Amino acid sequence: MTLNKTDRIVITLGTQIVGGKYVPGSPLPAEAELCEEFETSRNIIREVFRSLMAKRLIEMKRYRGAFVAPRNQWNYLDTDV
């Protein structure tokens, strides 16, 4: 099965979060940086953030960006986590 760009980025960032590249409480790179890194649009990155929030891996803070959620909030029933 072929994954779309959004799914590939969700898997990549999710793996980095679970693997410890980004520790709980730390910020993820800004939307613009992620757009550049993954060569995609802001709409795709926002969709990625929505997916990661649904998995409870990140929290969005208004005017501050995306932050890694505490481990006790992660949705361990999700197979991607």
At which residue positions do the language-model features occur?
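Short linear motifs at protein or domain termini
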Residues: 1-81
